[in-house]
Structure formats: C-alpha cells, structure tokens
C-alpha cells in the first residue's frame, strides 16, 4: 500500500490535464427559481431555462405570473390552469427564444387529468389553437420517442429541455409537473425542480441539480394512463 502511494505521488497529472478533467467533470448548473404558486411550474421552469441562456431575463414573481398567464391552457379540474408545451413554446418565442416540442402523441396533452367535460373541451380547443400558432411560427412539433441520450445531446448543443414529469417520485403525490433537465452523466440526470416540498425538508439548494438515475428519470417523465410524455427544448435568443 505504501509503494502504491509513492508511485501515485511520483507521477502527478499536469496542471493542464487536471484543469481539463475538472472542467469536464463539472456539471453545468442553471439558475434556480422556486415557483410561487402550486400551478406555475411551467412558467418557473421556463424562467430557469431562459435565464440560463440570457442573464438579462427578469427572474421575479411578476414575470413568472405573466408567463403562466400566457401558457395556462391545461385545465386541471380543480384550482388554476397549468401550462401546456405549446403555451410554454409561445411564451418563450414572445421573449425572443426558439422552441422545439417533442410529444408522445398528436394533439392536446393531459386531457385525461381534466375532470370537467367543459374544461376538457376548453383545454383541447386552446391547445389546438396554440399548436397551430407554434407551427405557423416555424417551431418544430414532433411526435417521437426519446431517452436521456437525446436530452443530453440537445443540452450539449446549447438547448435547455423542460420536461413533463409526475411529482410522485420527488414529492409523493401524483400530479403533472414541469421540471428542467439541467445536465446528465453516464448514470444520472440532474434536475432543477421548481417545486419545494418544505414538509419533507426540501430546500432550494436540494432541488437545484437534484439527481436521479436514468431509469428513475425516464419512469417519472411520463404521466397518466396514456404514459404521456412531453419536452420543450428552449434555445438561445433569436437573431
């Protein structure tokens, strides 16, 4: 054991190699924003994505609620409406960003979560209108399967993925929720989750870059009996 230690010290890495290794291993952190209501996770996630791409983006409650007001086309059946991928994409575009949407099926999402028939109809109508606007603006909407490698590639190319998940794994209930895919490595993904379950001892620091295995993340990144999946890739300010 002593010989092994002496050998390790006798051949240190160069400063350049050590610096490169440190840079490679350092996860890319995104600024964290804690949603201020129980229905503005989509808006809070978009604020984190935009702020990560442009430090001039306002990072406050007024902006959060402005974004929520624009994107709230998923009627939850109780309480206030939440954000659809199409509403998030349009809110990003209005602020100079480009978005791309991946969905597991065509048309409106999370209709199964809407309990009242009239709210289901309203949500479907508004999402269809927003989807048409997204397509007219040239933002891609793609029905596709995806995995962690696809999100990691998009992140490496400069996009920030906002992902639909269930709250069951992180918070114990089972509600549709938006989070930010901040980074990943060979075994884990790192998520900025805008919701903080303070009764579980969670803090903003705990929910910033929160780790999950690839398998756990893929299991949580779906919702409802149809296993609906949705991702909104936010890309840098439009030139």
Q: What are the functions of these language-model segments?
A:
Residues 23-30, 63, 95-98, 139, ...:
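Generic structural motif recognizing short loop/turn segments at the entrances and edges of beta-strands
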Residues 2-4, 8-9, 155-156, 160-162, ...:
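Noncatalytic regulatory segments and standalone regulatory/sensor domains
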Residues 88-89, 148-153, 179:
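Short amphipathic alpha-helical segments and helix-helix/interface helices
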Residues 127-169:
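Internal catalytic-core helix/loop-beta-alpha segment
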Residues 1-121, 125-132, 144-145, 187-189, ...:
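Active-site-adjacent structural segments surrounding the nucleophilic cysteine of cysteine proteases
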Residues 25-27, 32, 137, 147-149, ...:
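Residue-level detector of functional hotspots within protein domains
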Residues 68-76, 96, 138, 152-155, ...:
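Generic secondary-structure transition motif, activating predominantly at the C-termini of alpha-helices
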Residues 95-109, 137-149, 199-211:
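Hydrophobic transmembrane alpha-helix bundles
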